[in-house]
Amino acid sequence: LYIRPLLFGSEGTLAVRAASTYRFLIITAPVQEYFDRQGQGIYLKAEHRFTRASPGGTGGAKTAGNYAATLQPMSDSASAGFDQILWLDGVEHRYVEEAGQMNIFFHIGDTIVTPDLSGTILPGITRDTVLTILREWGYKIEERRIAMDEVITANKAGNLREAFGAGTAAVVVPIDRIHYLGQDLQLPQTGNHSLCQQLYQMITELQFGVTQDNHGWSVLVD
């Protein structure tokens, strides 16, 4: 069940300003898995031309307007065979930000690295869930900028153990390849015992009530 809160201005005006009245809705819809990957990781295109969000904008908020700039590049990437776009920063087009509707994580050595919340990245609920669980499991976490060059270097050196995305619709999904500047970066193959799979199992068990929720994340609806 996918649950999406929605708030929109409902004032009867065409004036270019904030509305004085709003309507709040909650949309619930049964959905299938976001990626029909059949156990395989997804294929991302690191976008170095188009930008999802820039400093000083609304990239850190879940606003409908943020999707406008992504529609054409997402359509183009899907036509080219990619599952999603890996968005880079809007200034240098070097630093990883997020992957489509997901926050992104890299398991490098004994550390989990994820882009920090700098105002252009959504503070995803699943991101927070993943970080909380990883800290409870004893993993070292770094929330910081990470450049594609660092990812490539870590992969070549054998230090990149896996990469995965996390979001409300996708839950947790492994990343198999990243296309960057005309080249494919093949990431380490992950299996049933990967960290990504462990996180997926833990989160879905919490969602379905199989595992006890000690965080107050689940709410019983009568």
Residue ranges of predicted features:
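Helix-start/capping segments and mature chain N-termini
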Residues: 6, 13-222
